[in-house]
Amino acid sequence: MTYSVRLSPRAARDYKKLEASIKLEVQAGLDVLQDHPLSGPKIKRLKGRLHDYWRYRVGDYRIVYAVDQPARAVYVEYLQHRKDVYRAA
């Protein structure tokens, strides 16, 4: 069963700013999250103040998201370079 992927306004803005080649990789990552948002080699649950979120690695970029299992939805909050993403969160 697939999940719907929804971008926050911040994540949508970050997505628009990406270079075309990175956009393709990120889009492939978002497609993976539709089918398997909670398990996989590039997926990890975050700790500390972000304990309700998960992250998916896409090269040097990170997709930080929350999962609503009853609604079958993935809410992408942040989509940024790894050096910036945890500062923004």
Question: What residues fall within each predicted segment?
Answer:
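Enriched for short, Lys/Arg-rich terminal
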Residues: 1-24, 57-61, 66-89
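A short, surface-exposed loop/turn module that caps and links secondary-structure elements
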Residues: 31-56
